[in-house]
Amino acid sequence: MKNLYRLSPLAVLVLASCSSNQTVDPNAIPEGTILKVALLETTDLHQNILSYDYYGLKADTSLGLERTATLIKAARAENPNTVLLDDGDVIQGTLLGDYQAVAAPVTCSGTLAVHKVMNALKYDGAGIGNHEFNYGLTFLSQITNTDFAITGVQKPGACGAPNFPLVLSNVVGVTSLKPIFNPYAIIAKQFSATKPDGSSIDVKLNVGIMGFVPPQIMDWDQKHLAGKVMVNGVQESANTYVPELRSKGADLVVALSHGGLDASAYSPKMENGSLHLSTTGIDALMLGHAHLIFPKAKEIGAPALDASLAALPASQVDTVKGLVNGVPAVMAQSWGRRLGIIQMVLKYQAGKWVVQKELTNVEARGFKYKDGTTIVDADASIAPLVDTEHKATLNYATQAIGTTSDFEMSAYFALAGDVSAIQIVNQAQIDYVKNFIASSTDTTIASYKTIPVISCSAPFKAGRNGPTDFTDVAPTATVANPFGLQVRHPGDLYLYGNNNLQAVKIKGADLKNWLETSAKQFAKIDPAASAEQDLVPSYSTIYNYDVFFAENNALTYQIDVTQAAGSRIVNLTYAGKAVVATDDFIVATNDYRAGGGGNFPGIDGSKTIIKSPDANQAVVSSFLKKQAKITAATNGTGQSWSFVKTITQGPVILRSAPGKIAVARTLGLHRVSSEGSLDTSGFAKYTIDLSK
């Protein structure tokens, strides 16, 4: 179905009837009438429609909107009055997403596969995430059928799009200063309430929704957004639009905030400023971006609360009840793996609906919610909706690129020193930048030929989204039986197809600070502690763990995890000499990092010397094709970093995919000494011997 209208920036009325009975005039609603409502949330779907891994060409029952659909159906059966909302990052994140946006872009007459499914599931509304901007404003305008009123951004006509309102409150055009999407919408729902005498009555409830994205989109997608849009702070935007929503008749106001929780003092530039929306007069807060579970999961054997959430002040955040300064809040993880549910009770008092806060219940419900063991079945109606797109993606994914590998490239132990899935990325980036400089006719660029070129890349798929979320390319490869690489593999090695390669010119002091920031991923280990210690307490920001490399392994460094963050990097050398503060380096990286993504000191866009039109993923693909074959000796064993050797009294563990101790043995990672039991998230606990 095509969305043939541009919604008013003031308010949108979306009528959804839950009863054939005539709606009663609000004035006729008896005092004390009770209305029970469940707000349902998905977030960070990232085009994970089916329970399928396009990189590994295998089923993955831990994810997929087709199973979330089963959770939605169950929640609707339990709660007759529901509002289904999404918190953004829908269109990008799998090969299916890249196929529909880049390899074979969906036409105006078509509709994105994920939007087709969301339409079928009858979503009531959605926010916008930072990854919605990855493919550019013209593509986003087309697939949402929205006129942004920005010069040079023009959709080709009335295009296939979601059937529900999309809202974004804090992104405006630089010329118009008006929101490019509707800043809010009012969804008029007809629900069944209970009068004081116990009888039923049909009532109308106006649910107002607003959407927010991190201001950092201006850094992360600068190439698409610079000079076209600007981003306002989430709190300032909410303070503008909450009163408008109330004045337009919103009974409930829900913030769809594509950001996590940060208890730091508020700043309009905060990436995760959602906590500060709780003081703006909203009634409910739906969270995203961080790919975490909030509140703590309730099913039997539920995963432990992420360390970053557990560290939030209890005076502001109740991680059990799901309250942020008293406002109910939920984050449904990512990839369709959970459904956020906020059950609210409203009482009709003095002519308006009043939330009975003490009766609110919040849950981030997972696939095993019934008994902690049984995974819900997929909704059989979903797969047929996207069968054509699924088959086309598989055909695309399995095309040969003409290169073989004699070794497995995996990220199971990337946080224990393995570089088998990272070195090839760094080699590709160095090769690109050196060739760029060598062939440049720009006199400034040409003058950099004598400066060492190094590279950094992060293990993007290293457990952030659960124990199945690990890069693993060519798992069966051996010297005797090389593995033929396919189109899908560069995306497994470098997940983000939207990143473009950039290079920055830095000093040795900058390099040291960069490495110190990366090393914050590790916990501070107490050698005298007898209790078990996690080497990596949270994988939520694993994309900020940059691993550096130079040709011939000329760059080496050590990490001392017994020291406080900021004081961990020692023995930093290049070509056998200690790196000093004034040394010059050129670092091949991506536009996200070069532009300031991750808040690395001094890396803020001002040191960028090369802005490539080529995506990092494409650079990796081209490099692989040029090699004809890659080998462990040349492309997978250049371990540039190690831990400072430390004897610990108690066990230090690293959580990774189960059953991979043989991988560590093959890699020669002797510090990975044994595989232990599974934790409640399904990760295996590997013992790390820091003395080796």
What would you call each of these model-derived segments?
Residues 30, 35-38, 43-53, 83, ...:
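Solvent-exposed loop/linker segments at secondary-structure transitions
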Residues 605, 609-692:
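Terminal regions of secretory-pathway proteins
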